[in-house]
Each structure stands twice: as structure tokens, then as C-alpha cells.
């Protein structure tokens, strides 16, 4: 069935900000879908609130609206643009929920908008737990014994009937949000109450736990004629009970018999046919490891995290094919874009193994509860490809950037076998290392399989790796012969991993490899197991005989990607990498990307000329460089992951384009940077690097408290803190020196000033600043967690001139060619520099979109030797636009148990939204709504606990809230303060006092908003920490910065109405 000619203009809903459970995979699928629609001559209108995405670029859709993803704003776009169709399945859970709401409220009918692809009825059957269960029983597909409940009593009755443990799954939520496994009635009370609150329809499925069964997924495509293919099946190494987003996943499945494979494949197709899916769908099964019994867990009637993985694992462009199916094409009419000979109805065949390992944010949150369960906690993931499971797994382990090149982890060596057992029975992100340690101590394989629920097939593979590691540990380098080294390399061991075990340097192993000619060859991912030639291939390394890479003689550049999404290094860096590649291609240069993240646009098959899906380690990158012999390597756009390779590449005499390794060092090494600032006569907050607790105390005495302390060479403010007295400083320093004895700790005088930031481009002679950005929160809140305003609202002309002068001096002083990011503080009329990053930063996509300056494109051309004056955007500070744009951070702390919520110098946000308006108030209003910060709620109760040095500042804000009709609950001192000002307040007992106390007030739903300015951020023993956590877990707003609170209250005061606001198409 060819293209439906009635479809002329399609609205695509994006997935909004990156949160745990919904990351970069929807930028990848959304971009692919928009391109698929445009290829067919269809006009595409996009709404998405996330500025850090490729899909919101002006060339991806015809009209781009960076507006809040709410029914009100989507309706505005529909009313203005009048699309005839809506494609709902590309924006993750956010997009689906919005589409259902638009349908239910009659908005789609009112404007005559048809849903294309999977229908709303089918989406509901897939998402609504009750409808889904009814469909399954109608077609005789087994589901787990379960009950749908909408209140607490029914939930308890069901649990008592079938016994604990019980799995709680709320309807219409993301990444297992609000769900969990309840082992007792007390746990059920807590999980069920939250689940009912977070489900948009107040509905929760309680099901009998089949913890320990295998979890298997099928990624299936179906068209309107009922043709169905399975793109890929995947096996979770971790059993049911750990969310699939937190599981290690392998494709294709390794332990299913042919009968099991076919049985679940038939079930998947049966389910898609009965629900009437048109497009892609993910089906999850629980399979009893001891029989052929299985049960359907759930389906995702949309593209998902798993479909991004399946796409990258097979080379089959699921989102693009789904967009064509939505236009009316059938699978046998859609060409496979990788081969351009075969059609989309060919099932991909894999002659390799793919492993996905999640990337968790626990390095950012030391006190977090790391135990994995049904609620997803990973921020991102890596994918590794190998010719065998061991190779893919070891590649995956080193791709995580956790400093692990083997399965050995020092901290598990000290544990007893009982302690190790506990670590694998309640598995956390490090469970594989605990499991390896058990195997190292000859613990029986069948016992390990029994207590972990991991199939013996995988345990055997892990044991082989452990045995080889032990053998290496007991050997000397002279014992390593050609045959053994070849076998280790074939199974994925890295030079560094082998060297560490033999106590030699990686260089020694590299030398032996070169003598014996043990070098990797590269194989192709081509969707068809090599049966047809692929026109846009990507590659993985293996130690086989036949090499499939054709190396050209063209001028070529390698761009190093940024690896997995994590807090501090998110999708913004993928945005920069992709734009760099596009700029190089425009200049006729062959481009090669190296990256390992399956969720991103940069690893899509048709972005670069060649893609290497490899770990971003020294060895793996060097192998590719030696193979391709590029004219240069670009590191500036891959965040800290890429920058870390600068010194290594310099040692190997490999040319890097743009800023050199020595120049990077000048910006990142504290002493060299201080010398430069002195030479340039640029002020910075006083401070220095210290090597002991005693030095620190002495320096703090000189500077005067408060002081800012942090490790050197970090990303996203990791390990930074503001300390107010000696006790706090000693606590911080003793911990910091314990973690890292090799580098100094930096200690600065903390200035409570206005923070200002620039991303600039330098060609070695001039600089261009696309825009000066101002932070709403004062210095001390990490720039990635601050609300950012552009153009600036409170910065004088003199200071702006000084910013340009300092930026130029610094860029030329360091010798920057390309990007530089500088953060300033304005304090009492003076300008200080607090940080310089010699690379692209996370604000690049935001400032590119709102200033309309193609920053990455210009920076790339400058790195290749062009001059700013010839590129059409001039030099100096670029002219300011009329519209005001704010970037508002979005947090995922609710999904991470026992994690600090409080804003401070260490970054915590996972994503961001954009608010665009004619005035700052309008922009902030949209930004807050986009970030799901409640500003519409009329009246309510504020729980306030304010520390002493913030009380004076809090009063005028409290008075404003009071005049808006808000009631107050407060602890003794804050209550006294409010009473003195004539504000009515209910006093509540402190945490240490008897019930009912402050936590009970939160748990009894007496509060709508918590305002808590912390006395000491990161110590979870403090009351403030428990108050903030209790509030976040009840889905309440928690505000810890008075600057943010003041902005929210000012906006509430203005009483802005949705209907009076304009929406802006940013595509022109």
C-alpha cells in the first residue's frame, strides 16, 4: 500500500528533557522519523521542549516549536499549524501520554487531526494494564497472576491472598517510576501509595513475583497489512526483578533453545496482530528457566530504549521504517537504507554478539542506595560488539569509563564469601565484580547460577575470563607466547588489562602485538550477515583473519564521541559531535566517528562516512587511528571523555585538530592556569592547590570562610562542596584525600556573586562570543543546575565589555583554536574568572539555537584553519535577539533512593528544557511548566525550614506567598520569624522530636511545597537531608535555593495565563 496521499502535514511530539528512563534514544528515533517523513515530501511540524537535541534543529523538521509538552501548548501548535496527522510513537512515554490526553479531551477531533501509525485504541490496549490483560486472556497469552487496583485496601487484600513478594507496576509511567517489589505489608503501603499518585490514571497493577525467571525481549515491526518481522530478540543477563534498563542485555539471545525462540517469536507476532500495532513494538517476556512456561510482562507500543539498542545492534533503522509504515507503506515496499537492495521485510541476521551495559550515576551520589530493582536508575548505556560473548562483554566493561579493564575489583578482595553472597543476592551496579570474585574463590558454578538467577551459560563465560586473569597474575611477561596473547585478544582482553595482571605497562603488550602482528581487523554490521553489500556500514573490531574495512586515500578526520549519557556529560556533547561531522562533510572531508552509545544520533548509520562502534579507550582509539591514518583527530566535542585522550595522542605523535594537549593542560592545571591569569592581569577568587588537611586549614584561615573545595580534573563539579567552618572542611578533605592521593585539592574563597557564562570561538587571532549567558542562581550552584538566561538581564555594559576583553585575552593566551567555555563571577562590581574549559560545553546547543549562530560549524572550520572574519558572523559579541530564552534544569533524583536533592556545586540534573518568551516572565513561566515545576497551583501549604544566614532574605518571599493565600508550616526558629512578621504559621516538631513531627506532616500529605535551605549539603545524617528525601519521594516540589524560589513566586504573582502566550517557530 503506497503513500497515503491525504497525509500532507504531520505533527511529531518529542520526548522532552532527559530523565532517568527516557534518554537520548528518543532524539535518535525522533530525528530518524522526521527525516523519513520529509523524504516522502510530507511537511513536518515538531514540538519538543529539549534544546539539547538534534531533532529540534531547523533542518530536521520544517517547523520547530521548543515549547512545553503540555496539552495546552500542543493545542496552540495544532491551532496555528493545522496538521492533518499526528505521529505519537516517537516521543517515548511523554509523547504517548500526551497523544492519549489530546484524544481523550477531544482536541484531535476538534482540529481534524488523525493519529497515524499505531492508533490511540491500540496504544491504550498496550499501556492500560487492565485493557492489556483482557486482550491477553482473549488471545490465550499467559500473563502473571495479577490484580488491578485503584486504592490501598484492594491492594492489601490481593497481597494477602497470593502472598509476598508482590511487584507494583503503575500504569502510564516511565522506567518503572513509582513501582517496586514489596516484601511485606509495610513496604506495600509505601510503594503502592506513591504508585497510585504517580500513575496519570491512578491505576496500579499488582502481580505475583516471578523474580528469577529469564527476561527476554522481542523487537517487532508490523505494517497495516499485518506483515510482521522480528528485528531482534534480546536476552537480559539479569533475571526478572531488575528493570530491563538496569540489566546487562545481550543480542541475539544466547541461552534459548530453538523451540523457546520460536515459541516467544510466535507469541510476539500474535500480540502485535491482536492489538493492531502499526510500526515498532517491544514485547517483554518472563520465561521459566526450568520449563517452557512463559508469561507476557508488558509491551511498549512505540519506539523505546530497547528499539534503539535493536536498531544499532542489527543496523535495521526501526524508527525510520515505523515512520514509513505510518504513511501507509508496507514492509515489502520500504527499502533497507543500509544495503539499498534488500527491503524492510527481511529479518536481520547477526553473525556477532552485542552486549549493552547500563551506565549508573552512583559516582555522583556517594550515599545512594545502589540495589537494583524494578525501578530504573541508569542514566545511559554503552553497547559493545564482538565476535564472541567474552569479547563483547570485556569491551563493554572498559567502555563504561569506571577504570575497569578486567573483572577484578580491589574492594571485593577483602570481603568474605558470605558478604559476597549478600552483594549478589541483593544485586547492585557492581554485582558482576562480586560474582567474579566468588568464581575466583572456586565457588561452585551451579550455586552461583542458583543464587543470582543468571544462566549457567554466562557464569561459565565469566569463569573462563576469571581463570585467564588468575593465570596471567601468576605469570611473567616472558610466559606470554604468541598463541596465548592471540587467544586473549580474540576474547576481548585489552592491552591494559593484560599488562595490569602481568605488572608491566600496556606499551610492553602493544610492542609484543606488533612483533607478532596481532592486530585487530574490523568487521561490518550490515543487517544481513554479509549476504549483501552494505553501502553505509559501521564496524567493530575483532581478532579474525578477513578485514572488511576499505581504507581510502581521501582527506579524513576522526571525531571522538562522548560515550554513555551521564550526569555532567549528556546529550549536548552528542549534539556537538554530530554538528562537527556535518560541517566536515560539507567541506568534502571524509568523516569517521568513534563512539559506543547506542542511544544517540552520532551512532546512526548514515551520520558519518564511517562509524566505529568501539570503546573510547587509548588502545581502541589508537587501533582505529593506525588503521585509517587520518589527517587529524578532533577531541573538542566529546566532553571530558575525548579530552582525556589528548596527552596520549600527543605521545603517539597523532595530530589533533584545534587546541593542543599542552594548551588543554594550561587551562586544566591549576598552577599553570594561575600563572597565566597573573600574566594577563585577570582576577580569580583567591585560592590554591593543597596536598593535606593541615595545608587546607591553614589556607582557609588566610582566605576566610566560606570556602569552595574540589578535586582537580573533574567534570560536572564532581566532589565539589562549599564549607562554612573548620569541622566541615576537615570532614571533606579527609574523605577527598582518601579517594585520590595523586592530585591536589583546590581550595578557593567562595564569592556569593552573579555567575555569567560564555561559549566562545577563537581562531588564534580573534574571538566570537555568540551570546553572554546569565545564571539566575548565585555562584555556588553548579552551572548545569542553574537556570540560564539569554540575553543577560542584569549585566551592565561595562561588565559585558570586560567579559569580551577577558575572553579574548584568555583564548589567545592559552592558544585556543576552536571552542572555549568560560565561567565568570561578578561580585561587588568586579569580574572574576572561575573556570575555563578548552572544549565545547553543555550550553552549546542552547546558545546555538537561541542566538542562531551555528557554533559547532564555525568552530570546526576554524580548527581546519579558516578565519572568523571570513565566516559571516563577525567577531566580538554577536548581536542579541529580541526574544528571551531561559534554560531550566530537570532532575531525576526521585528515581535514586537516598540521594541528596539539594542544589550545590556538584551537578545533579539529567536534562533541560527551554522557555522562550517576549519577556523574561513569559520565558520563565514556560521554562517552569516545561520542567514540571508547579506554578499554576493556587494556594497551598508551604513547609519552610530556613537556615540562619538565609532568614532575612526569605522574609520578603514569604510575605509574597502569604499575600497569595499560601499557608505555612515551619519548625521553631523559622516559625518565630514568620510570626513576628504577622504571618500565620503552624509550628511543627523537628525530626528528632516525637511524632507527629516534620516527616509525618509530609507523609500525611499536609504539604504542597517544601522550602529547605540546607545547613550542610551532603551529610545524610542531618535532618535537612531526610526532610528533602521524604518530600521528593512523595512527589512534592523541593526548593533549596532562594533565588529559584523568588523567581517562582514572582511568576505566580504575575498570574500569567496560557492563552495569552505566543508560541515561536524557531526554524527560520
Swiss-Prot record:
Transmembrane segments: none annotated. Its cofactor is Mg(2+); Mn(2+). Residues 933-1068 are annotated as: Allosteric domain. Residues 133-327, 674-864 form the ATP-grasp domain. Pathway: Amino-acid biosynthesis; L-arginine biosynthesis; carbamoyl phosphate from bicarbonate: step 1/1; Pyrimidine metabolism; UMP biosynthesis via de novo pathway; (S)-dihydroorotate from bicarbonate: step 1/3. Binds 4 Mg(2+) or Mn(2+) ions per subunit. It is an enzyme of class 6 (ligase). InterPro entries: ATP-grasp, ATP_grasp_subdomain_1, CarbamoylP_synth_lsu, CarbamoylP_synth_lsu_oligo, CarbamoylP_synth_lsu_oligo_sf, CbamoylP_synth_lsu-like_ATP-bd, CbamoylP_synth_lsu_CPSase_dom, MGS-like_dom. One of its GO terms (cellular component) is cytoplasm. It catalyses: hydrogencarbonate + L-glutamine + 2 ATP + H2O = carbamoyl phosphate + L-glutamate + 2 ADP + phosphate + 2 H(+). ATP 1 binds at residues 129, 169, 175-176, 208, 210, 215, 241-243, 284, 298. Composed of two chains; the small (or glutamine) chain promotes the hydrolysis of glutamine to ammonia, which is used by the large (or ammonia) chain to synthesize carbamoyl phosphate. Tetramer of heterodimers (alpha,beta)4. This is Carbamoyl phosphate synthase large chain. The lineage of its organism: Bacteria, Bacillati, Bacillota, Clostridia, Eubacteriales.
Amino acid at each position: 500500500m503506497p503513500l497515503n496521499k491525504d497525509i500532507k502535514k504531520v505533527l511529531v511530539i518529542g520526548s522532552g528533557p532527559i530523565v532517568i528512563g527516557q534518554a537520548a534514544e528518543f532524539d535518535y528515533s525522533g530525528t530518524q522519523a522526521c527525516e523519513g517523513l520529509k523524504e516522502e515530501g510530507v511537511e513536518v511540524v515538531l514540538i519538543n521542549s529539549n534544546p539539547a537535541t538534534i531533532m529540534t534543529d531547523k533542518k530536521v523538521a520544517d517547523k520547530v516549536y521548543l515549547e512545553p509538552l503540555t496539552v495546552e501548548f500542543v493545542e496552540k501548535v495544532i491551532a496555528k499549524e493545522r496538521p492533518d496527522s499526528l505521529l505519537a510513537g516517537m516521543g517515548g512515554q511523554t509523547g504517548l501520554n500526551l497523544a492519549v490526553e489530546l484524544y481523550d479531551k477531544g482536541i484531535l477531533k476538534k482540529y481534524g487531526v488523525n493519529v497515524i501509525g499505531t492508533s490511540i485504541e491500540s496504544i491504550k490496549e498496550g499501556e492500560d494494564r487492565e485493557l492489556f490483560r483482557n486482550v491477553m486472556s482473549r488471545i490465550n497469552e499467559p500473563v502473571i497472576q495479577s490484580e488491578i487496583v485503584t486504592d490501598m485496601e484492594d491492594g492489601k487484600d490481593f497481597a494477602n491472598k497470593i502472598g509476598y513478594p508482590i511487584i507494583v507496576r503503575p500504569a502510564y509511567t516511565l522506567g518503572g517510576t513509582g513501582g517496586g517489589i514489596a516484601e511485606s505489608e509495610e513496604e506495600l503501603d509505601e510503594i503502592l501509595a506513591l504508585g497510585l499518585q504517580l500513575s496519570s490514571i491512578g491505576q496500579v497493577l499488582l502481580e505475583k513475583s516471578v523474580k528469577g525467571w529469564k527476561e527476554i525481549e522481542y523487537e517487532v515491526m508490523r505494517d497495516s497489512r499485518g506483515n510482521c518481522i522480528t528485528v531482534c530478540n534480546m536476552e537480559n543477563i539479569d533475571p526478572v526483578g531488575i528493570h530491563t534498563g538496569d540489566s546487562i542485555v545481550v543480542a541475539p539471545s544466547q541461552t534459548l533453545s530453538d523451540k523457546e525462540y520460536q515459541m516467544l517469536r510466535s507469541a510476539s507476532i500474535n500480540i502485535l496482530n491482536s492489538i493492531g500495532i502499526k510500526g515498532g513494538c517491544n514485547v517483554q517476556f518472563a520465561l521459566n528457566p526450568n520449563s517452557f512456561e512463559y508469561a507476557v510482562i508488558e509491551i511498549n507500543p512505540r519506539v523505546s530504549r530497547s528499539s534503539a539498542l535493536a536498531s544499532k545492534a542489527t543496523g535495521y533503522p526501526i524508527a525510520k521504517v515505523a515512520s514509513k509504515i505510518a504513511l501507509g507503506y508496507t514492509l515489502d515496499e520500504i527499502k533497507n537504507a543500509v544495503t539499498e537492495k534488500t527491503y524492510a521485510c527481511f529479518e536481520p541476521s547477526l553473525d556477532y554478539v552485542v552486549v549493552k551495559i547500563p551506565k549508573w550515576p552512583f559516582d555522583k551520589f556517594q550515599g545512594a542506595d545502589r540495589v537494583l530493582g524494578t525501578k530504573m536508575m541508569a542514566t545511559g548505556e554503552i553497547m559493545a560488539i564482538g565476535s564472541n560473548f567474552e569479547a563483547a562483554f570485556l569491551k563493554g566493561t572498559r567502555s563504561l569509563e569506571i577504570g575497569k579493564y578486567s573483572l577484578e575489583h580491589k574492594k571485593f578482595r577483602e570481603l568474605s564469601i558470605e558478604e559476597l553472597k549478600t552483594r549478589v543476592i541483593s544485586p547492585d551496579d557492581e554485582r558482576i565484580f562480586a560474582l567474579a570474585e566468588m568464581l575466583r574463590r572456586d565457588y561452585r558454578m551451579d550455586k552461583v547460577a542458583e543464587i543470582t538467577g543468571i544462566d549457567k551459560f554466562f557464569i561459565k563465560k565469566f569463569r573462563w575470563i576469571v581463570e585467564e586473569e588468575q593465570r596471567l597474575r601468576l605469570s611473567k611477561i616472558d610466559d606470554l607466547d604468541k598463541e596465548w596473547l592471540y587467544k586473549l585478544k580474540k576474547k576481548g582482553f585489552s592491552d591494559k588489562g593484560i599488562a595490569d595482571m602481568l605488572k608491566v605497562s600496556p606499551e610492553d603488550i602493544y610492542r609484543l602485538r606488533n612483533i607478532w602482528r596481532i592486530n585487530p581487523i574490523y568487521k561490518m554490521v550490515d543487517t544481513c550477515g554479509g549476504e549483501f553489500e552494505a553501502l553505509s556500514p559501521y564496524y567493530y573490531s575483532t581478532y579474525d583473519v578477513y578485514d572488511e574495512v576499505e581504507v581510502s586515500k581521501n582527506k579524513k578526520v576522526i571525531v571522538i564521541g562522548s560515550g554513555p549519557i551521564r550526569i555532567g556529560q549528556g546529550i549536548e556533547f552528542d549534539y556537538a559531535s554530530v554538528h562537527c561531522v556535518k560541517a566536515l562533510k560539507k567541506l568534502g572531508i571524509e568523516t569517521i566517528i568513534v563512539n559506543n552509545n547506542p542511544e544517540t544520533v552520532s551512532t546512526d548509520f548514515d551520520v558519518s562516512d564511517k562509524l566505529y562502534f568501539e570503546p573510547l579507550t587509548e588502545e581502541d582509539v589508537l587501533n582505529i587511528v593506525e588503521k585509517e591514518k587520518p589527517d587529524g583527530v578532533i577531541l573538542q566535542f566529546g566532553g571530558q571523555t575525548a579530552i582525556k585522550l589528548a596527552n596520549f595522542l600527543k605521545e603517539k605523535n597523532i595530530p589533533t585538530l584545534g587546541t593542543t594537549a599542552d594548551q588543554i593542560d594550561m587551562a586544566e592545571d591549576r598552577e599553570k592556569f594561575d600563572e597565566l591569569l597573573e600574566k594577563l592581569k585577570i582576577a580569580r577568587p583567591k585560592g590554591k592547590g593543597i596536598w593535606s588537611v593541615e595545608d587546607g586549614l591553614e589556607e582557609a584561615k588566610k582566605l576566610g570562610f566560606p570556602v569552595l573545595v574540589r578535586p582537580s580534573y573533574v567534570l560536572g563539579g564532581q566532589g565539589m562542596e562549599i564549607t562554612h567552618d573548620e569541622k566541615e572542611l576537615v570532614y571533606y578533605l579527609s574523605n577527598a584525600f582518601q579517594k585520590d592521593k595523586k592530585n591536589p585539592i583546590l581550595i578557593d574563597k567562595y564569592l556569593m556573586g552573579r555567575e555569567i557564562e560564555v561559549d566562545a570561538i577563537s581562531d588564534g587571532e580573534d574571538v566570537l562570543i555568540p551570546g553572554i549567558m546569565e545564571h539566575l542562581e548565585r555562584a555556588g550552584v553548579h552551572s548545569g543546575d542553574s537556570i540560564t538566561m539569554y540575553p543577560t538581564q542584569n549585566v551592565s555594559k561595562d561588565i559585558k565589555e570586560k567579559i569580551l576583553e577577558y575572553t579574548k585575552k584568555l583564548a589567545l593566551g592559552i592558544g585556543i583554536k576552536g571552542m572555549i567555555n568560560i565561567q565568570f563571577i561578578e561580585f561587588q562590581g568586579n569580574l572574576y574568572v572561575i573556570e575555563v574549559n578548552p572544549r565545547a560545553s553543555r550550553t552549546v546547543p542552547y546558545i546555538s539555537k537561541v542566538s542562531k549562530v551555528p557554533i559547532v560549524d564555525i568552530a570546526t572550520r576554524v580548527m581546519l584553519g579558516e578565519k572568523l572574519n571570513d565566516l559571516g558572523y563577525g567577531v566580538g559579541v554577536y548581536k542579541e535577539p529580541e526574544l528571551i530564552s531561559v534554560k531550566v534544569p530537570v532532575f531525576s533524583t526521585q528515581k535514586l533512593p537516598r540521594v541528596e536533592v539539594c542544589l550545590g556545586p556538584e551537578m545533579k540534573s539529567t536534562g533541560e528544557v527551554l522557555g522562550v518568551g517576549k519577556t523574561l516572565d513569559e520565558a520563565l513561566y514556560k521554562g517552569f511548566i516545561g520542567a514540571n515545576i508547579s506554578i499554576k497551583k493556587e494556594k497551598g501549604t508551604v513547609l519552610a525550614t530556613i537556615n540562619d544566614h538565609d532568614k532575612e532574605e526569605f522574609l520578603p518571599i514569604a510575605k509574597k506567598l502569604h499575600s497569595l493565600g499560601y499557608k505555612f508550616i515551619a519548625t521553631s526558629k523559622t516559625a518565630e520569624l514568620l510570626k513576628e512578621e504577622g504571618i500565620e504559621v503552624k509550628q511543627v516538631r523537628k525530626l528528632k522530636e516525637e511524632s507527629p513531627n516534620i516527616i509525618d506532616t509530609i507523609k500525611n500529605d499536609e504539604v504542597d511545597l517544601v522550602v529547605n535551605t540546607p545547613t550542610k549539603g551532603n551529610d545524610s545524617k542531618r535532618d535537612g537531608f531526610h526532610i528533602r528525601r521524604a518530600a521528593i519521594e512523595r512527589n512534592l516540589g523541593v526548593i533549596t535555593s532562594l533565588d529559584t524560589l523568588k523567581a517562582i513566586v514572582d511568576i505566580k504573582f504575575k498570574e500569567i495565563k496560557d492563552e495569552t502566550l505566543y508560541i515561536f517557530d524557531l526554524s527560520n
